[in-house]
Each structure stands twice: as C-alpha cells, then as structure tokens.
C-alpha cells in the first residue's frame, strides 16, 4: 500500500506543505490516482498548469509523470493563472485539467485544483483519490502518454478582449501581490484600452511585498495608497493564482465581493430577468433582497469554489460569487471562477459612469467585519469543533439559524457566522448589523459560545 499524508486531501482541493506533507512522491501518486478516475470516465487528455510558486516546476514534473505513466496525454500550458488553466481544460481537453497552485497560502504550501470532464473534483471525489492511492487502485497503462506544450495566454486574452466593450477608457491601478496574475493582468486591461498602473506584477513565489490575499484589508494598503496618491480611478487586486478579485475605490473603500456581486447580478439580470444568483453563506444579508429587487432569485450555498460551481450547474444560474473573492460568470463566459475576467466585467459596467467610485460606494452597505479567524489546536477537526459548539449554543433573539455550512444566525438587525475553513486549521467568523450596538450584541453572544471551549481564543 502506498503511503501518503491524508490531511492534504481537503474539501475542494489538495493542499499541503511542500517537502513535508506534499512530496514529489505524493504528486506522482496523485497524478496516477487522477488518471485512474479519468480512465473510468473515458478521459484520455488533461491540461496541466502551475502558478508562480517556487515549488511549481518540480511538482509539475512529478504529477505529469503520474499522468503519462498511466497513459494520459498531457497538454502542458506552463505558468498560468488558474482561470487560464480552466480555459485550456474547457476549450482543449473536454473540461479536464489540473492546476498546481497554493492559491493564497504561505510560500511553502502548494496544491492541486482539479477538473475532470467538466466537473470540479470536491468532497467525496477528492477522498476517492486518497482511497485509490491507499488501495493501489491505479489504472493499468497501455502505452505511455504524450506531452504537448502550448502557450494558452494569447487565446485567453483575445477571448476576453473580443467581447468585453468599455464605454470609455479607464485609468486603473492593479496589485497582483507578486502572484501569477501579474504576468497577464496588465496586458489584459491595456488590451481593453485602459491606462494601467501596475503594482507587484513581477511573479515572485516568495511574495516579498505582501501576501497575495485580497480578502484581507492589510494586503490592499499599497493599492489604496496608489489610488490616493496617483490618478487612477479604481483599483483591482488578485490572489496568488488570480481566480479571486479585490476591489478598492478612489477614496480607499474596499468593496467586498458580496457587494461586487450586487453590481454583477444587476448587470446580468438586466439581460436575464428572473435568473438565479448564487452566493455563499458568508455574504451580506443585503444581497438577497437586492437580487430579488432586481428581478432575480437568490440562492445561498455553502462556501467553496467547487460547491458554488456544482450549484451553478444544477440551477443554471448565470452568475455567482463568494465572499472570498471568487466570482463565477456563466453568462458570456465558461462558469469558472476568474478574477481577471471579473475585473474586466467590472470595468465594463463602471466605464458607463464618470464617477465609478460613486457607483460602488452607493451599493447597499451595513456595518460588518472582515473575516475573523480563530486558530484551532493542532490535530483538531474544525467541523467537529463547530458541531460541539452548536450543540450547546443558545442565541437569544435569533430569527433563523442556517446550518448549510457551519452556523449562520440571523437576527432582525444583523447576523453572525462561524464555520470551519476547508483549507486551513481555523474557524472563520463574520458579523454584520445595522448599527454598531447591534454588531457588538451579536458578537458578544458568539463570544460566549466560542469561549465555552477553553482552547479557542476570541479574535477581537
């Protein structure tokens, strides 16, 4: 029986520390396991790409060997943003592809995001890969698979610039946080006719300037400063593999993705009245009424890019988004999460206004916290911790308790959320309310619940 670290098999990707839990041997075995799943589905060709992390080339070589030793033909698209790998998978490989990326994890992490036959591997499908490895259930290869190399970037950029139409050229600033998006974002937005100020767009897997995670306000401070000190109208930021988008106004306001989705939903619903719009459990309580007001049907889903994608497939929703910054367009695009493309769609909408910051700042808003994190003790199961807390929790004045993903407690004047992260050993909390007094009241109720476990430290 092959041995592999079990804890790298997460809810919607595989992710671990390079050389410790995610070894070269693990990459090879994962390649063989994916090939076995592919063989079951009659898939013979898989697109393979990597982000800008230093461990990428070596992991790529080993997973590639796992594929070709199993008779799978590989389309190697090299260093790309995750959405570009998805683009190659959909257009060249029947929806099958593997992206080597650590997303926004620290530099010593890396991992794999996987699609087979148009379906994102998640949950049980990822556990099946582990089972194949542990039972040596690999497919018997006939002949060795081939490797074809292709630069997909030109086709990808052309596909976007071919259908996005700005009403006027804009002046924008972008911050790629030294992630792989920096290699392509400037070219894309200049190709749409904009003036672009580029921050940290050279790809550097050590992330020397700030972490490439636009969901954290501290990582947007350089972009905010560039907007205040320069002549750019709007700022766009990307995570390490550019499948997530951050947005900042001229006056330094961060427009979180749930508010971005208001604008995207309104735009899509103009052309698709009555359509469904999907959002995750972390999103503002102002989003569902906004979607309904603009003629759409609002659907709340559990957090995670693969869960959102499968919900889009099931419901036929043309647009979806989640609080971490993944925005998904099926209308005029392919349905996968794409920070670069979402940025282009945002500019298309904002270019109709002479004051884009005003358009963004006018979106409904209440008082809210960013994501708050509580570190879990080594070896503890976040979902189990949440279940234990929920079992003894009481929330006075709650109007609804939603349990699709952790515990989201609705009150007449706000909500509180606690859920287990699927990618890191933390609990994620978020609060929102109509007034500061209400948000503090809701937080205090959650604080009492959290502190009933002596191993958890309240983050505020």
Curated annotation (Swiss-Prot):
| Residues involved in Mg(2+) binding | 103, 239, 241, 243
The alphabetical list of record keywords is: Carbohydrate metabolism, Cytoplasm, Glucose metabolism, Isomerase, Magnesium, Metal-binding, Phosphoprotein
Q: Name one GO molecular function term.
A: phosphoglucomutase activity
The UniProt note on the cofactor reads as follows: Binds 1 Mg(2+) ion per subunit.
Listed SUPFAM superfamilies: Phosphoglucomutase, C-terminal domain, Phosphoglucomutase, first 3 domains
Q: Name one GO cellular component term.
A: cytoplasm
Q: Which cofactor does it need?
A: Mg(2+)
Superkingdom of this entry's organism? Answer: Bacteria
Instruction: Please report the name of this protein according to its UniProt entry.
Output: Phosphoglucomutase
State the organism named in the record: Neisseria meningitidis serogroup B (strain ATCC BAA-335 / MC58)
């Amino acid at each position: 029986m092959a041995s592999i670290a079990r804890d790298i098999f997460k809810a919607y990707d595989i992710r671990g520390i390079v050389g410790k839990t995610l070894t070269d041997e693990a990459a090879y075995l994962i390649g063989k396991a994916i090939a076995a799943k592919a063989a079951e589905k009659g898939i013979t060709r898989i697109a393979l790409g990597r982000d800008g992390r230093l461990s990428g080339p070596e992991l790529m070589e080993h997973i590639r060997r796992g594929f070709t030793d199993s008779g799978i033909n590989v389309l190697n698209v090299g260093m790309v943003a995750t959405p570009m790998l998805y683009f190659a998978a959909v257009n060249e490989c029947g929806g099958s592809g593997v992206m080597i990326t650590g997303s926004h994890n620290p530099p010593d992490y890396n991992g794999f995001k996987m699609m087979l036959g148009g379906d994102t591997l998640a949950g049980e499908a990822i556990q099946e890969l582990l089972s194949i490895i542990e039972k040596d259930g690999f497919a018997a290869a006939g002949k060795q698979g081939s490797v074809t190399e292709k630069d997909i970037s030109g086709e990808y950029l052309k596909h976007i610039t071919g259908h996005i139409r700005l009403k006027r050229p804009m002046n924008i600033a972008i911050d790629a946080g030294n992630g792989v998006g920096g290699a392509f974002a400037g070219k894309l937005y200049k190709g749409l006719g904009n003036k672009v100020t580029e921050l940290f767009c050279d790809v550097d897997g050590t992330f020397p300037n700030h972490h490439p995670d636009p969901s954290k306000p501290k990582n947007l401070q350089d972009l905010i400063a560039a907007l205040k000190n320069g002549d750019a109208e709007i700022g766009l930021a990307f995570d390490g593999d550019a499948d997530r988008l951050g947005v900042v106004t001229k006056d330094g306001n961060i427009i979180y993705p749930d508010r971005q989705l208001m604008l995207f939903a309104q735009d899509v619903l103009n052309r698709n009245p009555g359509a469904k719009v999907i959002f995750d459990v972390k999103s503002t309580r102002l989003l569902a009424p906004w979607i309904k007001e603009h003629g759409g049907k609002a659907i709340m889903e559990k957090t995670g890019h693969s869960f959102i994608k499968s919900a889009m497939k099931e419901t036929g929703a043309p647009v979806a988004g989640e609080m971490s910054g993944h925005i998904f367009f099926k209308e005029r695009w392919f349905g996968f999460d794409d920070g670069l493309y979402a940025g282009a769609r945002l500019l298309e909408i904002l270019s109709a206004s002479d004051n884009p910051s005003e358009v963004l700042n006018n979106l409904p808003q209440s008082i809210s916290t960013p994501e708050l994190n509580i570190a879990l003790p080594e070896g503890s199961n976040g979902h189990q911790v949440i279940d234990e807390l929920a079992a003894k929790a009481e929330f006075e004045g709650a109007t609804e308790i939603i349990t699709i993903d952790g515990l989201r407690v609705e009150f007449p004047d706000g909500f509180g959320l606690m859920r287990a992260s699927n990618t890191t050993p933390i609990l994620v909390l978020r609060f929102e309310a109509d007034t500061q007094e209400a948000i503090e009241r809701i937080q205090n109720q959650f604080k009492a619940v959290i502190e009933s476990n002596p191993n958890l430290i309240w983050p505020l």
